[in-house]
Amino acid sequence: MDSCHTTKSCVLILLVVLLCAERAQGLECYNCLGVSLGIACKSITCPYPDAVCISQQVELIVDSQRRKVKNKLCFPFCPANLENMEILGTTVNVNTSCCKEDLCNAPFSTGGSTWTMTRVLLLNLGSVFLQTLL
């Protein structure tokens, strides 16, 4: 009976370690600044402990000519949207969205990171394994 209890404890500790592993690695976000809307961005690991991934659509208006670009980055906090801000004769509109999951600032849904899907799978397998030990 003591051996069974030890096995359960080891499995539980392993599951907790695996579930916490992703945060120890840091949040991953796509990162690019001022690129055209169709251009892909590379991913980076954020250096900030409580980071958010940011996706921005920026519209620049100069003499009635419009140009749209995107920014994707990680940041320590979520900045506010900017509407009709005048900078040196240029009107700037920035639509910002923030999220806290790995690679969540993609232009389309990625279905989650590999680590997130692995954690869900391990959690399900671990719970089944614990039920069989009980």
UniProtKB/Swiss-Prot annotation:
Residues 1-26 form the signal peptide. The gene is Ly6f. PROSITE patterns: LY6_UPAR (PS00983). Keywords: Cell membrane, Disulfide bond, Glycoprotein, GPI-anchor, Lipoprotein, Membrane, Signal. Coiled coil: none annotated. Gene3D superfamilies: CD59 (2.10.60.10). One of its GO terms (cellular component) is side of membrane. PANTHER family: LYMPHOCYTE ANTIGEN 6H (PTHR32217), LYMPHOCYTE ANTIGEN 6S (PTHR32217:SF3). It comes from the Eukaryota. A lipid is attached at G112 (GPI-anchor amidated glycine). Disulfide bonds join C29-C53, C32-C41, C46-C74, C78-C98, C99-C104. Residues 113-134 form a propeptide. Its main location: membrane. It comes from Mus musculus (Mouse). Residues 27-119 form the UPAR/Ly6 domain. It is found in: Cell membrane. It is a lipid-anchor; GPI-anchor. This is Lymphocyte antigen 6F. SUPFAM superfamilies: Snake toxin-like (SSF57302). InterPro entries: CD59_antigen_CS, LY6_UPA_recep-like, LY6H/LY6L_nAChR_modulators, Snake_toxin-like_sf.
